[in-house]
Design a protein with these regions (language model features):
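Short Gly/aromatic-enriched secondary-structure transition segments
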Residues: 24-31
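Glycine-rich catalytic cores of cysteine/serine-nucleophile enzymes that process amide/ester linkages
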Residues: 25, 38, 51-54, 62
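N-terminal cationic-hydrophobic initiation segments that often serve targeting/anchoring roles
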Residues: 32-35, 129-130
Length: 181
């Protein structure tokens, strides 16, 4: 990816249970197991708020291949930020943190960000606004297709729940731009 073309941020979750300590190296292994060259995200925010570097910004991302407002796949012009979590967790009989399942046996999406993760995410996004001409901050789910053509990505249109919170309302462009002054 050409860093001069970066104009968007896409926020993700790792889709791992709340409280389970997962690091960028773990996500890298998961992504390589899928046949990818390396971790798809540029940044990973750990449970304690540590921001880890993932895929270099000089490489195309591997986090959101949907085309954005520019008509170009986000992987070509966006920064991918992933927070660890996003699935409701529970502790099993062995004391391991595992996904909590609903009545149909599906994982339960949930905003599991710790206070430290929220603080780190806000700082990182505002820092990126100072470094790049960002015009869009979205959650991965916001890149789902607008099936009914009403200009809004409604919940029933989401391909996935990731990142399990409303990124657009938490990071409105006007507020982020105002932070530059």
């Amino acid at each position: 990816m050409n860093p001069n073309k970066i104009d968007a941020i896409v926020v993700h979750c790792s889709a791992t249970p709340a409280g389970k300590d997962v690091r960028a190296a773990d996500i890298d292994r998961m992504h390589r197991a899928k046949g990818w060259k390396m971790i798809g995200y540029n940044y990973v925010i750990d449970l304690d708020g540590t921001i880890e570097i993932g895929r270099p910004l000089t490489m195309d991302g591997a986090h959101c291949n949907t085309a954005g407002v520019s008509g170009v796949a986000y992987n070509k012009h966006s920064i991918g930020i992933c927070y660890v979590g996003g699935i409701e967790g529970t502790t099993n009989a062995k004391g391991q943190i595992v996904p909590k399942l609903d009545a149909r046996g599906r994982q339960i999406p949930k905003d599991t960000r710790t206070d430290a993760q929220k603080t780190a995410m806000h700082k990182l996004i505002l820092d990126l606004f100072h470094q790049y001409p960002i015009v869009e901050v979205i959650g991965h789910r916001d890149a789902s297709p607008d099936k009914d053509g009403n200009g809004v990505i409604n919940r029933y249109e989401w391909i996935k729940d990731c990142p399990c919170f409303d990124v657009k309302s938490e990071f409105p462009i006007a507020i982020c731009r105002a932070s530059k002054t």
